[in-house]
């Protein structure tokens, strides 16, 4: 399906990279017109999903989900402390950055797998990101129910981590 998507995205004028193996998975990097970077990743263990019948994309090429998320930080220690001690994630592996500069550290939550991973690239020479076009200003994590949302909001507040509290997912 990555070949299909490379052609589809190029036909629509997006900047598309080459299909490459990143962290053991076939992946395709591309950018939207504002410079926002995205990656399509094949997942052989993906759960069976029902295709959308009205999609212009053939069923065998439809996207099944989101993940993993990749963030860039100037140094690992502060982010790792929050991920492990506040967010209860597990560090599961590292891999060489696809651009050849540094290491990407992989943290996992819940059952794991691409949709439950956060990849942290240590890139000290990058400028600090600004909010606006071409950037992501927040990430949302799924929880099973409302009591879990309230528990996480309380945990973050107790640890003095700024947070939005409960946000209805359909808002987006």
Model-assigned labels for residue ranges:
Residues 12-15, 53-55, 90, 124-125, ...:
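Short secondary-structure boundary micro-motifs
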Residues 1, 45-80, 86, 90, ...:
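N-terminal beta-strand motif that seeds the catalytic metal site of vicinal oxygen chelate
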Residues 61-64, 85, 101, 105, ...:
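Histidine (H) residue identity feature
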Residues 1-69, 111-114:
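Active-site-adjacent scaffolding segments
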Residues 1, 30, 36-45, 92-135, ...:
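Conserved short beta-strand elements that form part of the metal-binding/catalytic scaffold
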Residues 1-33, 72-82, 140-172:
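Vicinal oxygen chelate
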Residues 10-11, 50, 81, 88-101, ...:
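Extended intrinsically disordered, low-complexity coil regions enriched in Ser, Thr, Gly, Ala
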